[in-house]
Amino acid sequence: MSSTQTTAAEPIMTDNVALRAYYESWDSRVVYQIIMGGTQHFGYWDKDTYWPFPLGSKLRRSMEQKLMEILALPKGSRVLDAGCGVGHVARYMAQHGMRVFGIDIIDWAIEDARKAAKDAGLSKEMMSVEKMDYHHLDSLASESFDGVYTMQAFGHAVDPQKAMAGFFRVVRPGGRIAMVEVERKTAAKHDDPNDRLTQELKMVNDYTVMPTNEAASEDYFKNLLEEAGFVDVVVRDWQPNILPILRLFYSLVMIPYLFFRLFGNEKSFINMICARSGYAGRSRWRFVAITATKAGEKLEDHKSK
């Protein structure tokens, strides 16, 4: 496999001010740290339960294990974590034999991800993290990765077609892509604009800067992958497997939500609205895990490489 080469020029960055503001807000940092232990993705439960504890094993092991299973690459594979956040997924992948190159645009998250790698004793060959925008992968060599994955990060894409074309270019033939993301069950245009839940779901996507979440409906990701050139697309519905954490978040925020709504300032706490509307509106969206392949021979084990 070719090395992950970069050009001398600095990677192009989209100055997404709103996205940076969301992740740098005290609301987001406190919620993710206190409730999620820093992890920025849902957990995975094999069976529904009203007692989802302990959260850590479901957040940092079960979901990451499921992602690794569906990515289905041999140990030693070089993978791109597009939108790596604080690096918990990348760390898990590296600890289980992958060589991970994580990219993100949020400065504090990049520093946390690097610290996570260092604290885990991972070499830069096993896990490295750089500031880079997944819409602009021109500084990465073509066919330099065995796979790419996103974990609840592609919803932030402002140009999903461009980002997907970049993923396709950097993945070698036979390589894989796995995406764990959110899509609507029906297009937004079919929702009643005067319905409060409709308004809150749109507010969440707007305030958390997730235009692709707002646009995505059934077959959206399948079509996006196929248009980019990927084949053998498989879409899995994992929403039943995240219900325990959706229900937990809902139970934690309902009393403060009603209080702040009484005074008309609930919009100041967007993660609270996200937790409320996510569970209340769960019949309107799906949590999907999508995989696809770039046509070519199946990748071999990298033990000898």
Curated annotation (Swiss-Prot):
GO cellular component, one term: endoplasmic reticulum
Keyword Transferase: yes
EC number: 2.1.-.-
Gene Ontology biological-process entries: ergosterol biosynthetic process
PANTHER family: HYPOTHETICAL LOC100005854, ZGC:194242
Annotated function: S-adenosyl-l-methionine-dependent Diels-Alderase; part of the gene cluster that mediates the biosynthesis of ilicicolin H, a 4-hydroxy-2-pyridonealkaloid that has potent and broad antifungal activities by inhibiting the mitochondrial respiration chain. IliD catalyzes the Diels-Alder reaction that converts the acyclic 2-pyridone intermediate to 8-epi-ilicicolin H. The biosynthesis of ilicicolin H starts with formation of the tetramic acid by the hybrid PKS-NRPS synthetase iliA with the partnering trans-enoyl reductase iliB since iliA lacks a designated enoylreductase (ER) domain.
Family: Belongs to the class I-like SAM-binding methyltransferase superfamily. Erg6/SMT family.
Protein name: S-adenosyl-L-methionine-dependent Diels-Alderase iliD
Phylogenetic lineage: Eukaryota, Fungi, Dikarya, Ascomycota, Pezizomycotina
Gene name of this polypeptide: iliD
